[in-house]
Amino acid sequence: MARKPGKQYQAAQKQVESKEYQLEEAIPLIKKIKFAKFDETVEVHMRLGVDPKHADQMVRGTVLMPNGLGKSKKVLVIASGDKQREATEAGADFVGGEDMVNKIQSESWTDYDAVIATPDMMRSVGKLGKVLGPRGLMPNPKTGTVTVDVAKAIAEIKAGKVEFRVDKTGIIHAPVGKISFSADKLVENASSLIAAVIKAKPAVAKGKYVRSATVCSTMGPGVAIDTAPFSVKAAAV
């Protein structure tokens, strides 16, 4: 049985109208109605008109948040030789080769937020699919996490690069900052994400691509947002 929302949540929800807000209106609203005592993450959720069971309708990609995410991500680099030194100098939190692969395999260790691997290590890293895959941590060339330029990849992740991927129900969930950020910074970050998702529309997708979108804080109610302006901008490019 679903738990009944608390009084604070219900009070916040009453301040949200049943309409689609412009993003510039929605962000100040979720800041106004917040009630949690901690610095919540602000998230965007987008329901897409795709069927992710078909490979040609998979939507995934990365976007660099112009204002970061308010949290320093822990980065693991799996590499060999000089690339290990390069990774350490670039600020990776954990660096290793086969030793790291063995640790993850034997301990199901996942105390990090992102994994970067050099191409020569992917034969070994491929064994880690059962541990890394379900957590969205598997390195992938499409997201820039399988690369020889480990320093650049580390810098981008530390600066706030977000990977997005549609789930099996056709929804993308992604963080765009902290509730303590200014409204302008959150609008800029959320705009970057929405634009990137629209740009990643599969060629075979038919009908309305973005079916609905909401923005919310960790504990707060969702506020529906109008993504039409972003689609218009994308079409004009």
From Swiss-Prot:
GO terms for molecular function: rRNA binding; structural constituent of ribosome; tRNA binding. GO terms for cellular component: large ribosomal subunit. The keyword Ribosomal protein applies. GO terms for biological process: regulation of translation; translation. It comes from the Bacteria. It holds the Pfam family Ribosomal_L1. Keywords: Repressor, Ribonucleoprotein, Ribosomal protein, RNA-binding, rRNA-binding, Translation regulation, tRNA-binding. Binds directly to 23S rRNA. The L1 stalk is quite mobile in the ribosome, and is involved in E site tRNA release. Protein L1 is also a translational repressor protein, it controls the translation of the L11 operon by binding to its mRNA. Part of the 50S ribosomal subunit. Belongs to the universal ribosomal protein uL1 family. This is Large ribosomal subunit protein uL1. The lineage of its organism: Bacteria, Pseudomonadati, Acidobacteriota, Terriglobia, Bryobacterales.
